[in-house]
Swiss-Prot record:
SUPFAM superfamilies: CheY-like (SSF52172), Homeodomain-like (SSF46689). Transcriptional activator that binds specifically to the DNA sequence 5'-[AG]GATT-3'. Pfam families: Myb_DNA-binding, Response_reg. Residues 25-139 form the Response regulatory domain. This is Two-component response regulator-like APRR2. It comes from the Eukaryota. Binds the target DNA as a monomer. The keyword Transcription applies. GO terms for cellular component: nucleus. CDD domains: REC_typeB_ARR-like. Coiled coil: none annotated. Keywords: DNA-binding, Nucleus, Transcription, Transcription regulation, Two-component regulatory system. It comes from Arabidopsis thaliana (Mouse-ear cress). The gene is APRR2. One of its GO terms (biological process) is phosphorelay signal transduction system.
Length: 535
């Protein structure tokens, strides 16, 4: 069936209805033809019109007789029958885009199929994604074969796609690439045509039409750059002497607004250098730029004017100062924003070259001052939390002879005199302390001598002087606490004795019982028998 343009216009759900020639072997690798049936069913599920062939000669004759009946061909190739499949590929590649499929994954076979003209090589089993996108090869072949070589079946496809893409392309161009408001070519033409309207007179001998053209091109590249007089003298840092220039020359100045303002120059004063052939001499001809077509006055920065400028900069801050704000604070009517901006740039550069070390020293001093409060707080904390030394200081200079190594550990403290007596009262006046494991020594006579402020090195400190360490108070047990401990041990003899108390010996117990009038003491055998009876 021949597809006409009218039929194609009704093809709304493209690529549905795509005609596919499916050439399969008579028997696949499984031997039951299930793979061929699956491939056909998958293509038909995508609304493709599938025509199946099992003989290469029959399929080739159908393509030759009715080329408009097919849009694409899918051919299966096997290692055993490569020659027949390749014959169909060589004959049909100029008419239909041909896709080769195979169950054997062989690089040599794949390369041979692509070399003979196959558009793609797919390995079975075929995925639905691959079969869904085979229409892309149809469109690709329709657009890349040329108008005269496109087959009859692909011409309607190409015309339909061209009509759709043409509309979309126009819309894309209008949206993405709008016509510029000021085309660059138009600007160039205006600059070149300006030579007919502008008459620039130079006071140089070797200035021709080519020099004027180069001058205009250099001026266009500069853009918003400001005019600077080229002189043989050096500019003073504090005083800038400029001349007043007059002119009506029109100059195109590109800014953010994109506006172009033209002026016409009657005469331009050009200062020559030693080498008059340098480009800077010709570029100095176009200098005067003014937005309101008035002559620009270049002021002389006198000391009084510079003083006002410095005061305004210091009030705003060197880093935050801008020309417009400086101009408002100075309140000088003869100055312009351009004059202030130029002078501000020179002022910052001059300050940067002269004051780098002073700024560095200021920052170093400031950081040091910020660090001092932390150091003061640490000293106050160290004074309030003075450590308590449990040992006297040793190893001071002058204690040991020269060359001698002081010992690592301090010498032991030497006690002077006897310790103070410890008066302890027994819990009962009739019971000896030895009977219950509390030995009581004889009373000690004598006085306890308090050691003076003497260190191990022999240094004497006066009374009341601070020696750097504190004497810990001697801790003595309280009599009430001792009485309570002894009473608890007597009332509960089955409990372990507290620390410091020893169990009484058998001799001391018998002696105490005899002293109290208890003479009959049961033997150990009686105690054992009594215990059995209690059980």
């Amino acid at each position: 069936m021949v597809i006409t343009a009218n039929d194609l216009s009704k093809w709304e759900n493209f690529p549905k209805g795509l005609k596919v020639l499916l050439l399969l072997n008579g028997c696949d690798s499984d031997g039951d033809g299930s793979s061929a049936a699956e491939t056909r069913s998958e293509l038909e599920s995508m609304d493709y019109i599938v025509t199946t062939f099992t003989d290469e000669t029959e399929a080739l004759s159908a393509v030759v007789k009715n080329p408009e009946s097919f849009h694409i061909a899918i051919v299966e190739v096997n290692m055993s029958a490569e020659s027949e499949s390749f014959k169909f590929l060589e004959a049909a590649k100029d008419v239909l885009p041909t896709i080769m499929i195979s169950t054997d994954h062989c690089i040599t076979t794949t390369m041979k199929c692509i070399a003979l003209g196959a558009v793609e090589f797919l390995q079975k089993p075929l995925s639905p994604e691959k079969l869904k996108n085979i229409w892309q090869h149809v469109v690709h072949k329709a657009f890349n074969d040329g108008g005269s070589n496109v087959s009859i079946s692909l011409k309607p496809v190409k015309e339909s796609v061209v009509s759709m893409l043409h509309l979309e392309t126009d819309m894309t161009i209008e949206e993405k690439d709008p016509a510029p408001s000021t085309p660059q070519l138009k600007q160039d033409s205006r600059l070149l045509d300006g030579d007919c309207q502008e008459n620039i007179n130079f006071s140089m001998e070797n200035v021709n039409s080519s020099t004027e053209k180069d001058n205009m091109e250099d001026h266009q590249d500069i853009g918003e750059s400001k005019s600077v007089d080229t002189t043989n003298r050096k500019l003073d840092d504090d005083k800038v002497v400029v001349k007043e220039e007059r002119g009506d020359s029109e100059k195109e100045e590109e800014g953010e607004t994109g506006d172009l303002i033209s002026e016409k120059t009657d005469s331009v004063d050009i200062h020559k250098k030693e080498d008059e052939t340098k480009p800077i001499n010709k570029s100095s001809g176009i200098k005067n730029v003014s937005g309101n077509k008035t002559s620009r006055k270049k002021v002389d920065w006198t000391p009084e004017l510079h003083k006002k400028f410095v005061q305004a900069v210091e009030q705003l801050g060197v880093d935050q100062a801008i020309p417009s704000r400086i101009l408002e604070l100075m309140k000088v009517g003869t100055l312009t924003r351009h004059n202030v901006a130029s002078h501000l740039q020179k002022f910052r550069q001059h300050r940067k070259n002269i004051l780098p070390k002073d700024d560095h020293n200021h920052r170093w001093i400031q950081s040091r001052e910020n660090h001092r409060p932390n150091q003061r707080n640490y000293n106050v904390f160290q004074q309030q939390h003075r450590p308590v030394m449990a040992y006297p200081v040793w190893g001071l200079p002058g204690v040991y002879p020269p060359g001698a190594i002081p010992p690592l550990w301090p010498p032991p403290l030497q006690s002077i005199g006897q310790p103070p007596p410890w008066h302890w009262k027994p819990p009962y006046p009739t019971v000896s302390g030895n009977a219950w494991g509390c030995p009581v020594g004889p009373p000690v006579t004598g006085s306890y001598i308090t050691p003076s402020n003497t260190t191990a090195g022999g240094f004497q400190y006066p009374n009341g002087a601070e020696t750097g360490f504190k004497i810990m108070p001697a801790s003595q047990p309280d009599e009430e606490m001792l009485d309570q401990v002894v009473k608890e041990a007597i009332s509960k003899p089955w409990l372990p004795l507290p620390l410091g108390l020893k169990p009484p010996s058998a001799e001391s117990v018998l002696a105490e019982l005899t002293r109290q009038g208890i003479s009959a003491v049961p033997s150990s055998s009686c105690l054992i028998n009594g215990s059995h009876r209690l059980r």
